Structures are given as C-alpha cells and as structure tokens.
C-alpha cells in the first residue's frame, strides 16, 4: 500500500519522511542489541496483558531485545504468552495487611520485598543493558509499586535513558511533577481523562475553548520540555516548542489496551534514535538534531498505532481487541515506511 492510499496530509507525509530517516537499514554489520533494547515496567497480579502488548509491539516493530519487568505473579502468565520476551519478576506489590499488627510498627528492613529501595536497586542494575524504559502498562496503583518505579525513573533520568510513561504511571507525575519536569527524554501518553487530570493537578492555565494544540502545548510547557502525546480522534504531540498533529485514519473501536501498542512502538523508535545518534550507519548530510528526535519518535509510534488500529478494525470490526493490533504491527510498518529494497517505489517514504 502506498502513502497516497493512506490519505495522508502533506504535513503528515513530510514529518513521516523525517521519521523514516531514524529507521536503521538492515545491515549485516549490526549485532544483537544495537537496534534497541527496551524494557516495560508494569504487570501486576491483576494486569498481565498490558505489559505484554507493549513489549510485543516493540519487538514486532523491530527492536532487538524486549524485556518485561513485573511481579512474580504476573511473570508466569506473561512468560506463557510468548517465549520471545525476557521476563524479570523483580517488582513487588504491598504485602497483605496483617490484622493483628499495627501497620505503623511494621519493620520493612527485615522484609526486603517490602522495601522500595531494595526492589528498585535490582531494576536499576539492569539500566546499563537498556536503551529505553516504558513505565505504566499494568502497573496498577499499589503504593509499593509506585514507590519502586519512582526510584527507577529518577535513576533512568540520571543516566539519560528515555522513559515513556502511560496509564497509572501518570499518577506519579500528578503527585510529583518534578519526577520528569525538565527532562526532554520523558514522553507522556495520556488519554483524554488522564490528560485532564494532569492539567488539573499541575494547574495548567488553559483558557476555555482553547484548541487541542494549545492545551497540549500548555501542559508540555508546564513540564518544561517533556514530550506529551494527547491521544484522541487525532493525536497531538508537543514538547512546548514544537507541536505535531497525527491525523492518519485509525479504527473506530476503542477497546482497552490499544495504548500499549503506542508505548511499545514509541519505545522502539526511541531505541532507533540512539542508534541514529551513535551513527551506526551513514545518516547522510544535514542530520536530524537530537532535540527533534524525541518528537519524531513519538510521531512514528502514533502513526504505527493508528495504522494498526485501522487494519485490525477492517478485519474485526466491533469485535476488535488489543491483541489484534499486535498482529498488524509489521504490516503497518510496511504500509507507512516500506523497506529498503522497496525504496525505488516512489510511493514509499
């Protein structure tokens, strides 16, 4: 399928042409791990699908190594979904309360599995092996889980590791905006409800009747350079300075879990961003600027997700589920970007 068949606006096609430059060629000189090592942190006793969908989208799009860091209860289930993912049962949920013990007297120093410092240290030890983190899919609202990932996010920020935050991880930003404020390697992917809660918590000043672009710009400016994707009928992406609109057609079914394809797809593009910055291939003259690449990665992930949704909806209609998007990731990539051996086709980007 050509880009014309996707009814792209000229502006969208121009941005996607830039995104295409981030995508690594398939060279024999590359070795395992150079084209993206992504970890999804989430997955709790009640939520095992979300981290799987995110990690599989990342893998299907083309990252070399896709990890899931979750609780032991979730790990067994996620491992059964796919042997292609590396699953680390390092997260812990708060222990069930003991009715015979006053919570204030509980000594967590004698129970390392209740100590967020101890738990997060094991995850932080993995950061040198990773290029990108996704935090939030299936995380839930357990306070120990939140305390743990907050420490991991700070450590990732100190290393300059990009972090994509979604779902319940956005609650952390509501409570402590300083966790990401001023970090241009952070990407937030709120839906309409989550976006409104962020704006309220951060006291974002947006006049009544303001446009969607004005709203997303205001939130991004409040967060001082964080990239925000406001998901909706169209996706609006802004870091407070540059704002992009993703207007590709998607599907009309809004089943839960589609945002997990988005986070995983963005993560792979951010992994490719590192390969691009490391000049693992000849990127040509007039290289894209480092500051621009995060927004382009977000745009690429949003475009892939919308095309996955369109393809899946065409097949499944109102029965569409999040797993149906996972099956469409590679075809969506080919439809939008093509592959190197097809670049002689002028319809490809």
UniProtKB/Swiss-Prot annotation:
Question: InterPro entries per the record?
Answer: Carbohydrate_kinase_pred_CS, CARKD, Ribokinase-like
Q: Which PROSITE patterns match?
A: YJEF_C_2, YJEF_C_3
* GO aspect biological process, one term: metabolite repair
Instruction: Give the domain of life.
Output: Eukaryota
**Catalysed reaction, written as an equation:** (6S)-NADHX + ATP = ADP + phosphate + NADH + H(+); (6S)-NADPHX + ATP = ADP + phosphate + NADPH + H(+)
> For this UniProt entry, what is the primary localization, expressed as one broad class?
cytoplasm
A molecular function GO annotation: ATP-dependent NAD(P)H-hydrate dehydratase activity
Which cofactor is essential here?
Mg(2+)
A single Gene Ontology CC annotation of this entry is: cytoplasm
Locate the residues binding ATP: 231-235, 250-259
Q: What SUPFAM superfamilies does UniProt report for this protein, alphabetically?
A: Ribokinase-like (SSF53613)
Q: Which UniProt keywords apply?
A: ATP-binding, Cytoplasm, Lyase, NAD, NADP, Nucleotide-binding, Phosphoprotein
What are the residue boundaries of the YjeF C-terminal domain, all occurrences included?
15-336
One Pfam family linked to the record: Carb_kinase
Enzyme class, one word?
lyase
Q: What is its EC number?
A: 4.2.1.93
Q: Which family does it belong to?
A: Belongs to the NnrD/CARKD family.
**What the protein does?**
Catalyzes the dehydration of the S-form of NAD(P)HX at the expense of ATP, which is converted to ADP. Together with NAD(P)HX epimerase, which catalyzes the epimerization of the S- and R-forms, the enzyme allows the repair of both epimers of NAD(P)HX, a damaged form of NAD(P)H that is a result of enzymatic or heat-dependent hydration.
This chain belongs to which protein, by name? ATP-dependent (S)-NAD(P)H-hydrate dehydratase
Q: Which organism is it from?
A: Fusarium vanettenii (strain ATCC MYA-4622 / CBS 123669 / FGSC 9596 / NRRL 45880 / 77-13-4)
Taxonomy of the source species: Eukaryota, Fungi, Dikarya, Ascomycota, Pezizomycotina
